[in-house]
Every structure is written in C-alpha cells, then in structure tokens.
Amino acid sequence: MDTHNKGDSIIRFSVSLQQNLLDELDNRIIKNGYSSRSELVRDMIREKLVEDNWAEDNPNDESKIAVLVVIYDHHQRELNQRMIDIQHASGTHVLCTTHIHMDEHNCLETIILQGNSFEIQRLQLEIGGLRGVKFAKLTKAFSFEYDE
C-alpha cells in the first residue's frame, strides 16, 4: 500500500516557451531569489489558483481568507471607531487583528478576514475610503487541496 500523499509527489512535465518568455522567467528567478524555474512556476500556479478562486462569484462560499493591511493617522478623529464599526457590520468574520504604532502619527493594523470574496473586498473598500486611511491593501488567499 502506498502511504505517500498524492499531493506530495512531484511530477515532471515540460513547457515550450518563446525565448523572450524564457528570458523573462529567468530574470524573475534571479530578481526574486528562486533556486530554480520549478519553484517560480509552482508559485505562479498557486497565485493563479488563488486569483481564479477569488474570481468565482459564489455568495455562499465562505472559504476565502484575506489579510487587510491598513496604515492610518491615529490622530484622525473617530477613525479607530469607524474602522471597528465597519468590521462589525460587515458580512465577514474578523479572525484576528494586530495593531502597531509606527511613529507619533501613524498606526499599522492587520486584519485577518474570512468570508465570501464580495464581502471581504467591500470591507477593504469601505475602510480604505475613510478619511485618515493612507494605505489599505488586501492580500487574498484560500485553502485548497492539491490532490482532488
């Protein structure tokens, strides 16, 4: 009986590319510090899978996970409370928040979210649109099985 997980086995396959695409791939390997073309291609495939999963518009799919990074002026009146109110009113699950003081005026907050893609992206737009918010970036993820 094979005790190895199918998702753990490595399958070798070949890809045909034009020279200019191969050159670009090799440049990215060097620029980003990858040890091989395979490592870069695996990361690119994972990125595309996440992107495609988030593009699927299923309001009942609560499997999306994201991290919202927000930098804001903590002297902006009532901004903290408005950010909290938006989180509570949203259709997403706020799993965790982390708050740090960057300097005298700026705070950085990370908010880990779970829910459907529409609600998570709406929360990002609402918080990002508040007066005093200087930066609001959403990093998208989802949990998927390789061996389905």
UniProtKB/Swiss-Prot annotation:
Keywords: DNA-binding, Metal-binding, Nickel, Transcription, Transcription regulation
Obligatory cofactor(s): Ni(2+)
Residue ranges of coiled coil: none
Annotated GO MF terms: DNA binding; DNA-binding transcription factor activity; nickel cation binding
Superkingdom per UniProt: Bacteria
Residues annotated as binding Ni(2+): H88, H99, H101, C107
This protein's record includes keyword Cell membrane: no
Disulfide partners: none
GO-annotated biological processes: response to nickel cation
Cofactor descriptive note: Binds 1 nickel ion per subunit.
Main function: Transcriptional regulator.
HAMAP family: NikR (MF_00476)
Family the UniProt entry places it in: Belongs to the transcriptional regulatory CopG/NikR family.
Protein name: Putative nickel-responsive regulator
Organism of origin: Helicobacter pylori (strain HPAG1)
